[in-house]
Regions:
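Conserved, structured core segments of small domains
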Residues: 1-118
Length: 118
């Protein structure tokens, strides 16, 4: 079994769609996420994951300069992640197929976790 990170990215379009949602629409969207993640967990493939707030800090360079970030000007904003344990990358991609982020023009990046203890 291999671990993969499913990295969720909101585009400016998807971020605007979230901002325009009524509380009822937001709850319906949250229910879709919970259903999708619950399905992955029910298969025993969920390792963990979280949603991320839109603001944070960025530390850059050898002087480790701290600035506000991520930047609003960016085309994509990392909005959350899941870590899954599956047989191969194709299975990780298949799990991402039902992600609700696609409904609002967001994307999922599937990345293998690097094993460092081998």
């Amino acid at each position: 079994m291999e671990k993969y990170l499913l990295l969720f990215r909101n585009s400016t379009v998807s971020e605007e769609a979230y901002q325009a949602m009524s509380p009822e629409e937001m709850q319906a969207n949250l229910d879709l996420w919970n259903q999708w993640i619950g399905g992955i967990a029910a298969q025993g493939k969920l390792v963990g994951g979280e949603a991320l707030k839109n603001s944070g800090k960025v530390i850059n360079g050898s002087k480790q300069v701290v600035t506000d970030g991520p930047y609003v000007e960016s085309k994509e904003l990392v909005s959350g992640f899941l870590m899954v344990q599956v047989d191969n990358q194709e299975e990780a991609i298949a799990l991402s197929a039902g992600c609700p982020i696609y409904d609002i023009e967001g994307s999922v990046e599937v990345r293998p976790i690097m094993l460092t203890n081998q």
